Each structure stands twice: as C-alpha cells, then as structure tokens.
Amino acid sequence: MTAIRVPRRRASADLQGGFDFSRPDEIVCGVDEAGRGPLAGPVVAAAVILDPARPIDGLDDSKALSAKKRDALYDLIVARASAFCVASASVDEIDTLNILHATMLAMKRAVEGLSVLPTLAQIDGNRCPTLTVRAEAIVSGDALVPSISAASILAKVTRDRMLVDLHERFPVYGFNMHVGYSTPQHLAALREHGPCEVHRRSFAPVREALDLMAGSR
C-alpha cells in the first residue's frame, strides 16, 4: 500500500475517467466511505469505475455538495459509470471489529463487488483495505480524483437514505434530520429514550446513555 499526499486541486483531464491515460493498461476504481463518525447505522463504502466516454460534470467531495446536487449526481453516476458497487458493514460488525476495521471491510466488499475487475484501487484517506488488486491511498482524494468523488457521493447518498428509512422504525431519534451524527437533538433523545438496536454501543455517547439508563432503574 502506498499513501499519496498531493496539493488540493482537481485532477487533470487525463484522469477524468476510470482509465489513467498515462498508464493505458490500468482500470482504476475510486473508493470512499460514508458514516465513520455517526453514533448509529452502518458504515457504507462505494467503489466506482468511471467511463471516460461518458464524463460527469460537477463531481466533488460529497460533503462539499448540497443534498440536491448529490442526488442529481448520484443518478448520473449510476447511469454513466462503467461499474459501481455500494457495500456496508453493519452496526454489529462496527462494535465487534471497531469502526476502522469495519470501514476497511466495507471498502473491500465494495471493490470485490464490482462487475469489472480493476487493476488499481485508489482509496480516499491514508489507509487501504487488504485487496487482491493494487491499492493506493490518496489524502483528500474525494476532492481530487473524480472516481473517488463519485464513490463518496454514492456512499453518502446511500447511507443518508438508509437512515431516513431507519427513522420510520425509530422516529424518536430524528435520524431523518442528522443521519445518526451526534447533534444536540440526537444526544438528548439518547438520554431520554436510551439507545435502540441500530446505535453503535462501542461509541462513547451511546455507552454513556446505556449507563444512564441502567443507573435510573
């Protein structure tokens, strides 16, 4: 695994698709995750191989985009990518493995689920999962490499939609508003109602809410 730190700028035109034209035999997939920090729900990862013949304008780090723009780009990525896969690691896996290892597992599942076998996986961040293909970590890759940007959008939109669905089952927590992050509203609901089955018990605020509920009995 290699880790690359590059200046924060957009990738060149030669890197706009899933093929690196300076290395014409490469099939490159971008990989990113969503949901490492929240107190509830799975961590989701996506892998994307872009089609250089079907470019997508406006790709960027999902966190820099509005929800409306993310949704529009999500549809374009799904329609135009050469291949993509979205995968996750469950709350139980997060609590058993820890969030870092669960994130690596979700990324591995996403890459292995691609219908096209890449020769290189470019991972956002400074760590790579263990893969059967070559991998390199790119710091701030979600803002620099279009295929990683695309992966960040698929992962973020997918996870946000999962949490909106979970809101229907557990409405007292407001998952539709904060998608599991530790907002004041979420923390107050945790203290009042205690955790539900989709809360990550390995995370300190959830453990504290459990202790509070146990102490009040």
Swiss-Prot record:
Reactions the enzyme catalyzes: Endonucleolytic cleavage to 5'-phosphomonoester
How is the co-factor bound, per the entry?
Manganese or magnesium. Binds 1 divalent metal ion per monomer in the absence of substrate. May bind a second metal ion after substrate binding.
Keywords linked to the UniProt accession: Cytoplasm, Endonuclease, Hydrolase, Manganese, Metal-binding, Nuclease
Q: Name the coenzymes or cofactors required.
A: Mn(2+); Mg(2+)
Q: Name the enzyme's class.
A: hydrolase
Q: Which residues bind a divalent metal cation?
A: 32-33, 124
Taken from the UniProt entry, a GO cellular component term is:
cytoplasm
Recorded hits in CDD domains, A to Z, give:
RNase_HII_bacteria_HII_like
* RNase H type-2 domain ranges (all copies): 26-215
The residue ranges crossing the membrane are none
- MF-aspect GO terms: manganese ion binding; RNA binding; RNA-DNA hybrid ribonuclease activity
Instruction: Report the InterPro entries cross-referenced here.
Output: RNase_HII, RNase_HII/HIII, RNase_HII/HIII_dom, RNaseH-like_sf, RNaseH_sf
Instruction: Return the similarity comment.
Output: Belongs to the RNase HII family.
HAMAP family found in the cross-reference section: RNase_HII_B
What is the documented function of this protein? Endonuclease that specifically degrades the RNA of RNA-DNA hybrids.
Name of the protein: Ribonuclease HII
